[in-house]
Amino acid sequence: MGACLGACSLLSCASCLCGSAPCILCGCCPSTRNSTVSRLLFTSFLFLGVLVSIIMLSPGVESQLYKLPWVCEDRTQQPLVLQGPLDCGSLLGFRAVYRMCFATAAFFFFFMLLMICVRSSRDPRAAIQNGFWFFKFLILVGITVGAFYIPDGSFPKIWFYFGVVGSFLFILIQLILFVDFAHSWNQRWLCKAEECDSPAWYAGLFFFTFLFYLLSIAAVALMFVYYTESGACHEGKVFISLNLTFCVCVSIIAVLPKVQDAQPNSGLLQASVITLYTMFVTWSALSNVPDQKCNPHLPTKNGTGQVDLEDYSTVWWDAPSIVGLVIFILCTFFISLRSSDHRQVNSLMQTEECPAEMVQQQQVAVSDGRAYDNEQDGVTYSYSFFHFCLVLASLHVMMTLTNWYSPGETRKMISTWTSVWVKICASWAGLFLYLWTLVAPLLLPNRDFS
């Protein structure tokens, strides 16, 4: 009897994995929308790739792999071949990260193309989006195995520039998400203050606004101390000063009376969040400056105080990379878990709130202990755009894990000004986007920006 019950349980799990219903996760989250479950599972595939990349970057894994005589010879010699033209060096360091992230990006790019113009769950392709997870996992594994057989050649350099462009775009998406988060936060606390008639909510908004600006000022001071030097590091001084000036300007514009009249929910909380994020991007950019005098993250390799960049054989993680990875994880979850209550953000991110008619269906789903399909009359998010965001996320995490270092001609990682300029330009573009959200209702009064 026990064997029969076990077999039935296995068959049930198999039907969940191979069918069109996300049963396993729904069992853990019985009142979850079908669309949310699917996004979480796709995001888990991305995080699985990130975990594999982190493991392959670990120095301990590298040293243990080279100790196996049937895998690799001594690192000073030519590596052995594993069952075909696979260089075992591709299993290590930044080369493994490039290939793993190439696989995840290709996986999501395939689904981005496949899901173009899906309008509702009645489309047959919606069943593929929301189910068949076992086969999706097999596809991802197959692409990953194939990626590790890609010969080095010019692949790392070409893929580096793909990563630069994708990461630039994902930085802008992160800023949009921060704007939306701060907007929702500000709006809800103001509503609480009006409902409860309590000044504590206003005090909370003031405290966090003050805290974010205080952290931003501290970041500016620390960047001037550690990333600039008297008579040198002119680029760093200009970048810090310009971004500080731009942040002050957008903060002032956010509280102008005309802007407040057009957008009553705009305020210093959103501006403080954008200021703090801009300072982080600036810090991250300065950590890639290829000059040891202006970048304390670069170790000195010789007695002259100069850094021999070609001596870099491994990639280390600095503080900006760790913070960037945490922000990446939070923003990716943010994309997966919710739709915005801000119409402009919904339009830009191709999402929408759950329709009112879904409330009754949700209540029935909770009582029945199951997930419910909230996309019969129309999808709540663009499938293609969601996968496009995950493609950009794959490229961004690739650059984050490799510290934005460019692969050199001798299979080393080198720091370049390209990474610095891309991040600085991304910070400027992000500030411009935020500024546009403030002044657009004034410049285009005939359009609805509510």
From Swiss-Prot:
Top-level taxon: Eukaryota
Task performed by this protein: Non-ATP-dependent, non-specific lipid transporter for phosphatidylserine, phosphatidylcholine, and phosphatidylethanolamine. Functions as a scramblase that flips lipids in both directions across the membrane. In contrast to SERINC3 and SERINC5, has no effect on gammaretrovirus particles infectivity.
Subcellular location: Cell membrane
PANTHER family in the record: SERINE INCORPORATOR (PTHR10383), SERINE INCORPORATOR 2 (PTHR10383:SF22)
Membrane is among the record's keywords: yes
GO process annotations (BP): plasma membrane phospholipid scrambling
Family under the similarity heading: Belongs to the TDE1 family.
Catalytic activity: a 1,2-diacyl-sn-glycero-3-phospho-L-serine(in) = a 1,2-diacyl-sn-glycero-3-phospho-L-serine(out); a 1,2-diacyl-sn-glycero-3-phosphocholine(in) = a 1,2-diacyl-sn-glycero-3-phosphocholine(out); a 1,2-diacyl-sn-glycero-3-phosphoethanolamine(in) = a 1,2-diacyl-sn-glycero-3-phosphoethanolamine(out)
Major location (coarse): membrane
Membrane-crossing segments per the record: 5-27, 40-57, 96-118, 131-150, 160-182, 203-225, 238-257, 264-286, 315-337, 380-402, 417-439
Molecular function as annotated in GO: phospholipid scramblase activity
GO cellular component: plasma membrane
Membrane topology annotation: Multi-pass membrane protein
Protein name: Serine incorporator 2
Organism: Mus musculus (Mouse)
